[in-house]
């Protein structure tokens, strides 16, 4: 069929043609944001899930929903090696400049901009990557102590007061939160807690890998009372089929029931994989309908594409020792696995592998669902490791 009209869109953070199976969570967040705008008690929302489940796409769609409702937003991705103050400062400046155009909020927004100037100047020594334009001179004593926890609290209070005056809210949409240092997470939690205590319309909607829940708890013990942690998992069977059927139908293409069943089985409902199989099934089929035979042929191309992009980009970041650790996990199956079993597969002591395991957790490759357990953060990564490192040389 015509590849130009292929509706499927595999890619990191690429919006799918049909965002199936996520309506309930979108509605939950919509209600939360409307409540915070009205000054009602509301928990921030932190979505947790494996790679490839569509967290980034969902976060962006929720942001679109919020902005369509007249709510002010920040959109931040927290990459490794960047500080939270450096990520927040320029985005917050843009939001405050927008708020300053509201006549009711102008004075308070400008005060918050003075606070931002003091915040950036005071923290520049500790966080050298802070870069933000100054629109006003700092106000002495406002968010300028040089202590991130107290200064971020003061800054978000000032910003929340401006948003409240404008009858709106400020929502921080932050992706990859698991990469934020725990000290910086603690400061963010404290600031959000204070805003909630004062009924100021400032809230966080974030996303991260499953270890985020534990990191938030370690940063501040009361974090679990401030946040909801919905788990974003694979799509249901029905949602997976809708994610394929509806985009195809919009292009006047049918998909047989057997083809849909095979896609469900091959992808296990992971949205990234659903898009990959949809794309290759479309490109393989000569005409409508897409059949089971088309999907069977497409599976080889889909796996090869995943190996070269989705999986390989993560594999190439690993050291040889880390690759062997993950290959040992893969030998044991999808997981989770006990640390002792992984060590036994490598003929090593558990304690000697501790640094390797910690490095893999920091890189976002594995996580610990329970004490002593280890699991992949990337779906189907065990099968990839067996393909990329066949045989048993890894165990030597």
Q: What name fits each language-model region?
A:
Residues 211-227:
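Short regulatory helix/loop adjacent to the ATP-binding pocket of P-loop NTPases
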Residues 63-82:
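Conserved catalytic segments around the Walker B and adjacent sensor/switch elements
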Residues 5, 43, 258, 297, ...:
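C-terminal leucine-rich, beta-strand-based interaction scaffolds used for sensing/assembly
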Residues 107-152, 158-165:
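Conserved P-loop NTPase mechanochemical-coupling segment
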Residues 41-61, 346:
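Walker A/P-loop nucleotide-binding motif
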Residues 240-309:
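Amphipathic alpha-helical "lid/sensor" segments that cap RecA-like P-loop NTPase cores
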Residues 139-210, 217-218:
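Conserved Walker B catalytic segment
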Residues 1-45, 92, 105-108, 394-396:
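A short, basic N-terminal segment
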């Amino acid at each position: 069929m015509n590849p130009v009209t292929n509706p499927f869109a595999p890619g990191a953070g690429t919006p799918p043609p049909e965002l199936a199976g996520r309506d309930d969570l979108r509605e939950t967040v919509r209600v939360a944001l409307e409540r915070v705008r009205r000054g009602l008690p509301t928990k921030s929302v932190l979505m947790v899930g494996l790679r490839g489940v569509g967290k980034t796409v969902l976060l962006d769609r929720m942001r679109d929903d919020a902005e369509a409702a007249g709510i002010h937003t920040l959109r931040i991705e927290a990459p490794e090696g960047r500080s939270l103050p450096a990520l927040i400062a320029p985005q917050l400046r843009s939001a405050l400049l927008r708020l300053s155009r509201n006549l009711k909020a102008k004075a308070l927004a400008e005060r918050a901009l003075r606070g931002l100037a003091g915040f950036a100047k005071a923290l520049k020594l500790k966080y050298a990557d802070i870069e933000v334009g100054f629109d006003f001179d700092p106000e002495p004593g406002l968010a300028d102590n040089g202590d991130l926890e107290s200064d971020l609290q003061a800054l978000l209070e000032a910003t929340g007061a401006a948003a409240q005056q404008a009858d709106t809210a400020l929502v921080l949409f932050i992706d990859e939160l698991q990469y934020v240092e725990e000290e910086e997470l603690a400061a963010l939690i404290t600031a959000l807690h204070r805003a909630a205590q004062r009924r100021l319309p400032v809230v966080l909607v974030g996303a991260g890998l499953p270890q985020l829940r534990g990191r938030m708890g370690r940063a501040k013990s009361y974090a679990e009372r401030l946040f909801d942690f919905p788990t974003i998992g694979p799509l249901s069977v029905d949602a997976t089929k809708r994610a394929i059927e509806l985009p195809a139908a919009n292009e006047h293409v049918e998909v047989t029931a057997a083809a849909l069943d095979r896609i469900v089985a091959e992808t296990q409902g992971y949205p990234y994989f659903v898009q990959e199989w949809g794309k290759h099934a479309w490109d393989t089929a000569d005409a409508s309908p897409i059949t089971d035979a088309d999907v069977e042929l497409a599976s080889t191309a889909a796996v090869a594409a995943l190996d070269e992009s989705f999986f390989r980009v993560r594999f190439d970041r690993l050291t040889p020792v880390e690759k062997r650790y993950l290959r040992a996990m893969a030998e044991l199956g999808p997981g989770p696995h006990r640390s002792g079993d992984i060590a036994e597969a490598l003929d090593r002591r558990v304690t000697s592998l501790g640094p390797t395991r910690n490095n893999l957790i920091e890189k976002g490759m594995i996580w610990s669902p329970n004490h002593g357990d280890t699991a992949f953060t990337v779906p189907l990564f065990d099968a990839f490791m067996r393909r990329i490192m066949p045989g048993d040389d890894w165990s030597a």
